[in-house]
Amino acid sequence: MTLPIRTLDLPSLSLRDALDLAVLVDEEAKERYEELADQLELHHTPEAASFFRFMANNEEKHRLELASRRRHLFADSPSTVHRGMIFDVEAPDYSEAAIFMTPRQALAVARRSEEKAHGFFVELLAEIKEPEVAALFAELRDEEILHQELIDREIAKLPPDEPFAAADFADEPVSH
């Protein structure tokens, strides 16, 4: 995996920059989940959209916790990390949302995103020299495992998907 970040000197990353990076990762994921939820609502797939809204809320809660830690440690000192430096760290791919998506399929999308985030933090840790930064990224890496376990428990509660996809029975679009 190539790290989806640009122009960051990882070995010399400060704790402030690491917290800013983590806040941005959660912000990006939250926004993507909201976009996918909007898309699925348009496609009349409310159960899957609802799960993506749940994930967006979780990402926002985590973002706020990290932002609070950052403010506590560094007050309002300016950030040197910005959104242009990251792309698709934890956010689901846009192509993941599909018409007639089931809740089980939505959970699988979220699971893949959490796996992607875990891999990101594992790779980051290999580059980091600063002990405080390494500790933060190790904490975030471990949280991604907890998120995967949460999703696995939710998947286990669901009935199996139907053997046939709903899209197989959909009418073709009508032209006028």
Q: Model features per residue range: what roles?
A:
Residues M1-H176:
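Iron-associated oxidoreductase/ferritin-like identity signal
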